[in-house]
């Protein structure tokens, strides 16, 4: 088996008496979707923030592509290929679809926002941006204001922005949030197609999507991973059913 693309070992993070991460270890392997599930307040978003570099763990390590990145910040990790999408959209709603992707391409090259206007005319950056939009199926919406996109299209746009970083792994924090059944089904198909681009660590409450997509699932409860396994393993695990899935998880 090849080495993990992303390897988290024994992460601890506390806020006062609250242990948000209590010895968390997990990995993400090439070509897979590894889902992270758990009840509200389990520490999922805190864990993603530590992996992305927005929070520094109290102890433990984050290795990415064989490199210890525990002490690196968000920007450096992104440039190495950690592509994050957000639970709450970080897109610039008044900008066009293309402009949002150009901003991502600028950041990927370490160029500052003040260079945005000349970047709009940069043929190389525009090619990168249009290629990313084509990959997510938004090329025909390039000139549209981002605020006019549907919720699902905004999620696709977030992925396009992440693609400009040439990601080695995607960190996705509740991409299905706010979607109806139809939108969730469409986005599930889209995410399934992304695994050939880069593996995905997927934080998600939509269990239909998780069970359809995940190669492996880790269950986080009160800052601890209580189980990791295949969909079948997790569905049948008594501790997981008691802590999170309930009886519907066996249906």
Descriptions of predicted regions:
Residues 2-251:
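Glycine-rich phosphate-binding loops of nucleotide-dependent enzymes
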């Amino acid at each position: 088996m090849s080495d993990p693309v992303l390897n988290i070992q024994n992460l601890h993070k506390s806020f006062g008496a609250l242990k948000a991460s209590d010895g968390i270890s997990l990995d993400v392997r090439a070509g897979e979707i590894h889902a992270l599930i758990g009840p509200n307040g389990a520490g999922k978003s805190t864990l993603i923030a530590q992996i992305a570099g927005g929070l520094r763990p109290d102890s433990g390590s984050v290795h990415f592509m064989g490199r210890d990145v525990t002490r690196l910040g968000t920007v450096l990790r992104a440039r190495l290929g950690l592509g994050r999408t957000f639970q709450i959209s970080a897109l610039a709603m008044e900008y066009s679809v293309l402009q949002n992707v150009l901003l991502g391409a600028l950041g990927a090259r370490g160029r500052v926002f003040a260079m945005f206007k000349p970047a709009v005319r940069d043929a190389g950056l525009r090619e990168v941006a249009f290629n990313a939009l084509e990959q997510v199926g938004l090329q025909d919406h390039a000139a549209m204001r981002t605020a006019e996109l549907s919720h699902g299209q905004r999620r696709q746009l977030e992925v396009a922005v992440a693609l400009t970083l040439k990601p080695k792994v995607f960190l996705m924090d509740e991409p299905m949030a706010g979607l109806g059944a139809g939108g969730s089904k469409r986005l599930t198909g889209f995410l399934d197609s992304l695994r050939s681009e880069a593996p995905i660590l997927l934080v998600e409450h939509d269990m239909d999507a998780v069970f359809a997509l995940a190669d492996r699932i880790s269950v986080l409860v009160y800052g601890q991973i209580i189980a990791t396994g295949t969909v079948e393993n997790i569905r049948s695990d008594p501790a997981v059913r008691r802590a999170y899935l309930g009886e519907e998880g066996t249906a």
